[in-house]
Amino acid sequence: MGIIEDTMTENRYDSPVGRICYWVHRVSVEDNPSAPWLIFLPGLTADHTMFEAQIARFQDTCNCLVWDAPAHGKSRPASLHFTLADMAQYLHHILIGEQIQQHILIGQSMGGYLAQQYMALYPGETAGFISIDSAPLENMYYAAWELFCVKHTEGMYRSIPWNSLVQLSAAGNAETAHGRAQMRDMMIGYTRDEFCHLAGYGFRMLAEAIEACAHVSPMCPVLLLCGEHDRTGFVKRYNKAWTKHTGYPLVWIPKAGHNANVDNPHAVNAQIAHFLKFVEK
């Protein structure tokens, strides 16, 4: 059991593709009537545990919600017949059910893409967006060959022995021993076939969402965070182009890879805290 299971309330939402598990912690209205809502969205194949350090830091002063996306973590079994827009709709239904209105979306990798899809579908509902090792959803940033390769990730993963894939993924996504151990723990919660199929499906779903997205214009402050040692695809290049094109502030997280909030939670938490002060002004 971790801090999320120990201190947050587990709730469930029955989506068309399966039951979705999520965890909620509310700050006492008497203690902080204006406490913001932080919505944590893990990346592809990751689960809620990747945000443990953020929950520990902010749950005393902020309302927090974190989920396991469909087919991830405890949100299994689930039918792999959903789009990124469907995921945004499921999240929207959850937030409505919890009576959460203005909120700050904090998405790591795939979670950042989901946040952008959410803001495109439900403009004006989000008070702030923090991208952690994610990239823009708009198709102008991507070459056709890049999206083609993304769509064929499953075959590449299946060509690698499972134990080797676990070790390579842990080393590729994290820089620290803790980050790599946490990535391994998330991966071994799946069978080999389950992981490869989920990853392949998720990347195809993402590529299709990017191809269909010509423009996203968040109606809120945006902060881009990226591990200085992120070696996942072209994430660093995408973030450089993203900040150049939009003017969104980009902060490089030291001593961190693709899972920057796990590798260097102190630096990421400091950036989140600073962002919250800016949004609350």
Language model features with spans:
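Conserved loop-alpha-helix segment in the C-terminal half of the alpha/beta-hydrolase fold
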Residues: 221-256, 262
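Gly/Ala-rich beta-loop-alpha elbow adjacent to hydrolase catalytic centers
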Residues: 107, 111, 115
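Flexible "cap/lid" loop of the alpha/beta hydrolase fold
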Residues: 120, 126-158
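Active-site loop/oxyanion-hole signature of alpha/beta-hydrolase fold enzymes
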Residues: 23, 56, 65-106, 270
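Post-His helix in hydrolase/transferase enzymes
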Residues: 262-274
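Conserved HGGG/HGGXW glycine-rich cap/lid loop of the alpha/beta-hydrolase fold
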Residues: 18-74
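Conserved alpha/beta-hydrolase catalytic His-Asp/Glu region
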Residues: 140-142, 159-217
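N-terminal cap/lid segment of alpha/beta-hydrolase-fold proteins
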Residues: 2-19
